[in-house]
Amino acid sequence: MKSDIHPTYEETTVVCGCGNTFQTRSTKQGGRIVAEVCSQCHPFYTGKQKILDSGGRVARFERRYGKRKAGADKDQAAADK
């Protein structure tokens, strides 16, 4: 095997945008990784998920086609018979 071809595997501190920090090991130089989200603040792990409306597409759809009620389809089908 060739010597000195593998990067060093060192202790690294991961810092999240929420302020949470934890230690891990990585080959990234500098010993510090900055992350936007972690398991302490990510909506999937915290259970505080939100539906993101990208660019108002849901509102645009509702304006165009109207907001249907749950029983409206059944009432319409019964009226057609």
Swiss-Prot record:
Its cofactor is Zn(2+). InterPro entries: Ribosomal_bL28/bL31-like_sf, Ribosomal_bL31, Ribosomal_bL31_A, Ribosomal_bL31_sf. Disulfide bonds: none annotated. GO terms for biological process: translation. Zn(2+) binds at C16, C18, C38, C41. GO terms for cellular component: ribonucleoprotein complex; ribosome. One of its GO terms (molecular function) is metal ion binding. Keywords: Metal-binding, Ribonucleoprotein, Ribosomal protein, RNA-binding, rRNA-binding, Zinc. Belongs to the bacterial ribosomal protein bL31 family. Type A subfamily. NCBIfam families: L31, PRK00019.1, PRK00528.1. This is Large ribosomal subunit protein bL31. It comes from Mycobacterium marinum (strain ATCC BAA-535 / M). The gene is rpmE.
